[in-house]
Amino acid sequence: TNEFIYTLNENGEVLIEIVVQSGQYSGVVSLLGTFNIFPGDFISDVYDPNDDERVITVFFPILRLPDLNPHTDLINQVYEVSRPIPNTGLISSQGDFAQNSDIARLGWKLSGKDVKIGVISDSYDRISGVQNSLGDAVVRDIDNLDLPGGANSVTVLQDYPLGAASDEGRAMLQILHDVAPEAELYFTTGFVSEGNMAAGIAELVDAGCDIIVDDLTYMKGPFYRDGIVADAVNEATSLGVSYFSSAGNFGNRSYEANFSASASPNGIRHDFGGGNSLQQLQLEPGQYIIALQWDDDFYSLGS
């Protein structure tokens, strides 16, 4: 099973999002109860407490998925929760030197003191999976002064809860500690779902973060309007938080056009040019994710 498409657990369950028909949240909760799934099993994705009844994120038995099909009176749609794409490069960072922040610290006595910085990425301490104490890699980073320790240790609001991950968030925090060694550093995962990431942004704001950075892109996020993550970012910046994202520039990896009907009898097909309703793609061997979107409403976003 492709881990870039599906998130599975050891119980034969897949992580899904259930888009609830308007006003039917309690009905869906009752329905899930017949599968022995209860609100305590839901993944935390409450960004706006006044608007938490559109989407339920939960692990669901794979073999029982067809049993949801008859309940269109309660459920608008169900889809898998795909992991976001981390925008990481192939070269080790020399960010402190490249942006001359090392010179700024010397010339203006800047250290990041009294500044809170939040990081959103896949994980902080999950390279060996979920564990109850600090992993060896984190302890080593603190001992090597790559991360702050003692009273100024990184505050982890939520680490990735679903198994092992790459700890890219810890790598980002190492860079920030180089640049601003006295800053207070915070981390939360954004690797569970869009709703969970949006909730994480709000939690970092509530924690008093002055700056938030992330390196994630959700391919299912709306292309033609703001989604729940963008709404959370907009709310953060409206409160004075500086937000920086390496969301990725996919412009040169995409195709966008207004619909142009093909000639009869294929009028419902898009004409890519020259009467061609089939766009040819040449791909090298490997794994690819192709995302298609139309400028339509998103029911899960209330439109």
Where do the PLM segments sit?
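Autoinhibitory N-terminal propeptides
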Residues: 1-166, 171-178, 184, 215, ...
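Substrate-binding/access-modulating region of protease and related hydrolase catalytic domains
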Residues: 164-178, 182-303
